């Protein structure tokens, strides 16, 4: 390995000034801080000097002035989402992760969301699209937008997001975006606006708390030439990581909302199937098992 490659590996392995670090106590108490020369973190276990963290390897320990240690780790997206300051209920990481996968959101994606809230989903979107993608986030409550901007600025992700304060009934400024996600109760009222901003074949997604709302959205999706629609919920169960007595934890994150995904189609190309016709077609599709190459 040449000298330059060695320097790159070494740089990635150690804590640098300006990076986010997560300090974890032996009892799994977390602190996420941005490492600054001369900075200090005051905890009930003592003071942690940032200078004692700078240059240390990720995964090592740092000690407070009282001799208590913390592990030094890079925070993942899940930890960052749990640190989001909130005034309202935020989407759970289990739902957010599924949204990213189902809507094809990754490096370079241009995505629009409505219903910024505290910015949990916005954080994940900005994280996923990278420096070459962009997020347009609409919110009609000034106090919520202010909180979201603060949350993303703290994480260094605000430059990937354009925040807009507007009632989405007025429509969106953008066109040809790759994906649109609506976190609003009456998403079914805004599909005309969604069609105008979403590219043909693009991804649409929404989250809703009740089946009645989902039913209204399904009707509106069909009327507005969306197809290949999925409705689902994400159920997550953790297990206690103890080899001798492996079993589920006492608390389970079950139903948190209904997720709806669909694709924008050109007019006159979306399937025209009634409920009974859809069931019949689905049964036929299940019978048509493709032959595997020998």
Predicted regions and their residues:
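C-terminal substrate-binding/active-site "lid" region of AdoMet-derived donor-dependent transferases
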Residues: 2-6, 188-258, 266
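Short beta-strand element of Class I
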Residues: 132-136
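S-adenosyl-L-methionine
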Residues: 138-187
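Helix-to-beta-strand junctions that scaffold the AdoMet/dcAdoMet cofactor pocket
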Residues: 129-130, 157, 198-202
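Conserved SAM-binding loop and adjacent beta-strand
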Residues: 10-13, 83-97
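Conserved SAM-binding loop of SAM-dependent methyltransferases across substrates and taxa
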Residues: 118-131
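Conserved class I S-adenosyl-L-methionine
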Residues: 106-117
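N-terminal auxiliary segments of SAM/dcSAM-dependent transferases
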Residues: 1-74
